[in-house]
C-alpha cells in the first residue's frame, strides 16, 4: 500500500537523510527482491538530494520487516539478506511520528539534568538524617529531664 504524495512532500521538506518512507515507497512500487547494498545504490540515483547510507538502509529495512504493520519477504538463504516488501500499513509511519505520552512524573525525570537527578536521589538521605538528628535531640532533652526528676 503506497502513501499519498502529500505525506511524501511533508517528509522531503523536513529531512536530508533517507527515510523509511522512501525505502518502502520504492520497494513496494518495484516489488523487487533486493539487498540493502543494492537498494542503497538505487536510492542514491532516485533521490540525489538525500544522504543514503547502506547501513541506515539495512536498519530501516529490518525495522520494516519486524513491524506488525508490514508484509515482508526476507530471503535468508543468501548473504547479504534480501528483502521484498509486499505491503505496508500507513500506521507504521503514524506510530513513529506520534508524540510520546509519558506520565508527568516520568516526563519530568526524563528532562532532569544529572545534578538534579543526584539531588533528588540524595534528598531521602538528607531527610532521614534530619529526622534521626531531631529524634536524638528529643531523646537527649527528654532523657535528661526524666533523670533529673528521679
Swiss-Prot record:
* Disulfide feature: none
Q: Does the keyword Disulfide bond apply?
A: no
Task: Report the InterPro entries cross-referenced here.
Answer: ADC_synthase
Q: Does the keyword Glycosyltransferase apply?
A: no
Molecular function terms, GO-annotated = DNA binding
What's one GO BP annotation on this UniProt entry? Answer: biosynthetic process
Query: What UniProt keywords apply to this chain's record, in alphabetical order?
Result: Activator, DNA-binding, Late protein, Transcription, Transcription regulation
The task this protein performs is described as: Trans-activating factor involved in the late regulation of the P1 lytic growth cycle. May be the transcriptional activator of all late P1 functions.
Q: What is this protein called?
A: Late promoter-activating protein
Which organism encodes this protein? Answer: Escherichia phage P1
Amino acid at each position: 500500500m503506497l502513501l499519498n504524495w502529500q505525506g511524501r512532500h511533508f517528509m522531503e521538506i523536513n529531512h536530508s537523510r533517507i527515510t523509511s518512507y522512501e525505502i518502502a515507497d520504492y520497494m513496494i512500487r518495484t516489488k523487487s527482491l533486493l539487498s540493502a547494498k543494492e537498494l542503497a545504490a538505487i536510492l542514491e540515483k532516485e533521490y540525489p538530494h538525500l544522504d543514503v547510507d547502506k547501513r541506515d538502509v539495512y536498519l530501516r529495512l529490518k525495522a520494516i520487516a519486524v513491524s506488525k504493520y508490514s508484509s515482508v519477504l526476507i530471503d535468508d538463504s543468501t548473504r547479504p539478506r534480501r528483502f521484498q516488501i509486499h505491503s505496508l500499513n500507513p500506521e507504521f509511519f503514524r506510530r513513529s511520528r506520534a508524540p510520546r505520552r509519558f506520565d508527568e512524573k516520568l516526563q519530568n525525570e526524563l528532562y532532569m539534568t544529572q545534578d538534579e537527578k543526584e539531588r533528588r536521589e540524595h534528598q531521602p538521605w538528607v531527610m532521614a538524617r534530619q529526622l534521626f538528628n531531631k529524634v536524638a535531640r528529643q531523646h537527649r532533652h527528654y532523657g535528661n529531664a526524666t533523670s533529673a526528676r528521679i
